[in-house]
């Protein structure tokens, strides 16, 4: 995979020309739709930007279309909870696309408290020739109307309209960390630190609580929910991860309140590796079902793990993302970096996995060849047709010319949010306030 990934080129990068990064511009989520033709990003300023893939050029039929801005809208505004005297941030925590049912597209976006359903439609025609209205829409003087005409549709410049269809509020006491659309295309779930709710997409005033781990006495609280996702094919199954590093697979057919899991996936801790930071670094920051539905991918602070749904005792694969940080956990704890929540992603065939790291690095692991590569998303590599070169972090004194010392890593540059096109080798990488989109130089599989 190393050699093949070597030849990946940048497709497009969307760079905001700021000499400084404003907090509102920091990208907080990235998500392809089910066809990969649209890509949505959310930021800390509550905005959603949708990119659309351009059609392939007739002059170069084998060249891939690039992604251009399709629509931008303000999804959430800052609010204030007067009962609790708390500010509610406008930051977009998650975006999830709904499967397309007609010409329009729909997506869910959420901040800490409120989930919204948006409809995206196109208009390239407008009616003309009204009998009682003029071109500006004003009513005509009826005495001047002497004939009856049939209104016609005339072409116009393409207009993309985004409208809010539903607002799902008051469902969560704690901060929402994830949303997931069910395969039945009628329901979705939202999870906060202690509860998971099931919603119907057409009903906004009530939801069903399907998981509640809040203890009677909050002093007895030992773990929180960190992420959740529906199974891609079985609408009754979902998984949620915890800050203790465990995964619980639940079946909604068993009970209305899924307090008792169907399966518990947990890796026994090695006593020799026990330290003050063990529990913090074992917290699962993201969980993703494979496209096949057979496996689950989880990310904790130092590793990504692949779990087989049929084997609860331990993961079938473990990949070290940045093991060289193990000796620096103390300083990472002091700077709060140890609490960073990295996401992970599968490629379309479930054969390669991807996750982010520090210094604007991101990692890819080929499950078949067991090869891995470290790549960098940077302004230097953002020129069209630029080739990404593998990077290497060294720990000891000896290092090659292009190696980077672990002591020179920039921990303010972190890639937390990544997404992979559902069918092709196209990836989206959010690096602070910049979005990078990379694709294969040739239309071939990575491995």
From Swiss-Prot:
It comes from Rattus norvegicus. It comes from the Eukaryota. Highly expressed in brain. This is Serine/threonine-protein phosphatase 2A 55 kDa regulatory subunit B gamma isoform. One of its GO terms (cellular component) is cytosol. The B regulatory subunit might modulate substrate selectivity and catalytic activity, and might also direct the localization of the catalytic enzyme to a particular subcellular compartment. PP2A consists of a common heterodimeric core enzyme, composed of a 36 kDa catalytic subunit (subunit C) and a 65 kDa constant regulatory subunit (PR65 or subunit A), that associates with a variety of regulatory subunits. Proteins that associate with the core dimer include three families of regulatory subunits B (the R2/B/PR55/B55, R3/B''/PR72/PR130/PR59 and R5/B'/B56 families), the 48 kDa variable regulatory subunit, viral proteins, and cell signaling molecules. Interacts with IER5. Signal peptide: none annotated.
């Amino acid at each position: 995979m190393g050699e093949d990934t070597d030849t990946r080129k940048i497709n497009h990068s969307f760079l905001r020309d700021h000499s400084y990064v404003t907090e509102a511009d920091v990208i907080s989520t990235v998500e392809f739709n089910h066809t990969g033709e649209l890509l949505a990003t959310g930021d800390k300023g509550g905005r959603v930007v949708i990119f659309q893939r351009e059609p392939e050029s007739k002059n170069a039929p084998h060249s891939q279309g690039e992604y251009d801005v399709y629509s931008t809208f303000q999804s959430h505004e800052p609010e204030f909870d007067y009962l609790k005297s708390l500010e509610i941030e406008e930051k977009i925590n998650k975006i999830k696309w709904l499967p397309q049912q007609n010409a329009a597209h729909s997506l869910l976006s959420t901040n800490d408290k409120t989930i919204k359903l948006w409809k995206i439609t196109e208009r390239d025609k407008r009616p003309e020739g009204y009998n009682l209205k003029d071109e500006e829409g004003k009513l005509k003087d009826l005495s001047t109307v002497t004939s009856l005409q049939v209104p016609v549709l005339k072409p116009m410049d393409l207009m993309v309209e985004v409208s809010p269809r539903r607002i799902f509020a008051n469902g969560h006491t704690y901060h929402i960390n994830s949303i997931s659309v069910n395969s039945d295309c009628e329901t979705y779930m939202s999870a906060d630190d202690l509860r998971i709710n099931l919603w119907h997409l057409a009903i906004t005033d009530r939801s069903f609580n399907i998981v509640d781990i809040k203890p009677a006495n909050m002093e007895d609280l030992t773990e929180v929910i960190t992420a959740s996702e529906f199974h891609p094919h079985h609408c009754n199954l979902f998984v949620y991860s915890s800050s203790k590093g465990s995964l619980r697979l639940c079946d909604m057919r068993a009970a209305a309140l899924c307090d008792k899991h169907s399966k518990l996936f947990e890796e026994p801790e090695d006593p020799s590796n026990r330290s003050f930071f063990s529990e913090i670094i074992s917290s699962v920051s993201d969980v993703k079902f494979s496209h096949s539905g057979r496996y689950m991918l989880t990310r904790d602070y130092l590793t990504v793990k692949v779990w087989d749904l049929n084997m609860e005792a331990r993961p079938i694969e473990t990949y070290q993302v940045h093991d060289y940080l193990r000796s620096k956990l103390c300083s990472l704890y002091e700077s709060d970096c140890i609490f960073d929540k990295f996401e992970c992603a599968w490629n379309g065939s479930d054969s390669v996995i991807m996750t982010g790291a520090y210094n604007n690095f991101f990692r890819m692991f080929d499950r078949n060849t067991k090869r891995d590569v470290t790549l960098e998303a940077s302004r230097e590599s953002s020129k069209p047709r630029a080739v990404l070169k593998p990077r290497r972090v060294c720990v000891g004194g000896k290092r090659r010319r292009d190696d980077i010392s672990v002591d020179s890593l920039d921990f303010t540059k972190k890639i937390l949010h990544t997404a992979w096109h559902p069918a092709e080798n196209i990836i989206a990488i959010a690096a602070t306030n910049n979005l990078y989109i990379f694709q294969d130089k040739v239309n071939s599989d990575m491995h």
